[in-house]
């Protein structure tokens, strides 16, 4: 964390498989508008002024590319990070699996002491008929809240938050929780947030 002339500067880096909604997550939050087209990200940066607990912060949001082609380039954005958001799409079970197989190991290698949150994206598609039909054809189904909560506990995430960049449901909570994770390090509980509900679950250590 670096101190500016006014607000406290915080750095938040978003990681996860390609096309799970990382860029949409950031753009919808930073610009209050959902992007119309998908453009694979190499690296991008946004800055948003936010107030949490009556205090103002300048949150630097760093987007990263999830594709394997950028495996060597991506960690260049990791130094001085205050918190990571590991994203997966709730309608892409493979991206959920890769959280544990790829993204957690990568963060443990390059930023072992930095807190991270587990973020389930694209929840607006959970009940979408076309999406459900596509998943059914592959003998798959959307990732449920309980699965996300369980994985968050397994990997040691600060909390599990679900959101939709399209409808903005849960979107503000994602970044409020990210700031809280920075300001209260070494949390020993995982929280599940759905709307206004919050359930605490103790981690087994």
UniProtKB/Swiss-Prot annotation:
PROSITE patterns: RHO. InterPro entries: P-loop_NTPase, Small_GTP-bd, Small_GTPase, Small_GTPase_Rho. GO terms for biological process: actin filament organization; cellular response to insulin stimulus; cortical actin cytoskeleton organization; endocytosis; establishment of cell polarity; GTP metabolic process; insulin receptor signaling pathway; negative regulation of protein localization to plasma membrane. It comes from the Eukaryota. Keywords: Cell membrane, Cytoplasm, GTP-binding, Lipoprotein, Membrane, Methylation, Nucleotide-binding, Prenylation. Disulfide bonds: none annotated. It is a lipid-anchor. May be post-translationally modified by both palmitoylation and polyisoprenylation. GO terms for molecular function: GBD domain binding; GTP binding; GTPase activity; profilin binding; protein kinase binding. A lipid is attached at residue 202 (S-farnesyl cysteine). Pfam families: Ras (PF00071). Regulated by guanine nucleotide exchange factors (GEFs) which promote the exchange of bound GDP for free GTP, GTPase activating proteins (GAPs) which increase the GTP hydrolysis activity, and GDP dissociation inhibitors which inhibit the dissociation of the nucleotide from the GTPase. Residues 203-205 form a propeptide. A motif (Effector region) lies at residues 38-46. The modification Cysteine methyl ester is found at residue 202. It is found in: Cytoplasm; Cell membrane. GO terms for cellular component: actin filament; cytoplasm; membrane raft; plasma membrane. Interacts with CDC42EP1, CDC42EP2, CDC42EP3, CDC42EP4 and EXO70 in a GTP-dependent manner. Interacts with ARHGAP33/TCGAP and GOPC. Interacts with PARD6A, PARD6G (and probably PARD6B) in a GTP-dependent manner. Part of a quaternary complex containing PARD3, some PARD6 protein (PARD6A, PARD6B or PARD6G) and some atypical PKC protein (PRKCI or PRKCZ). Belongs to the small GTPase superfamily. Rho family. Plasma membrane-associated small GTPase which cycles between an active GTP-bound and an inactive GDP-bound state. In active state binds to a variety of effector proteins to regulate cellular responses. Involved in epithelial cell polarization processes. May play a role in CFTR trafficking to the plasma membrane. Causes the formation of thin, actin-rich surface projections called filopodia. This is Rho-related GTP-binding protein RhoQ. The lineage of its organism: Eukaryota, Metazoa, Chordata, Craniata, Vertebrata.
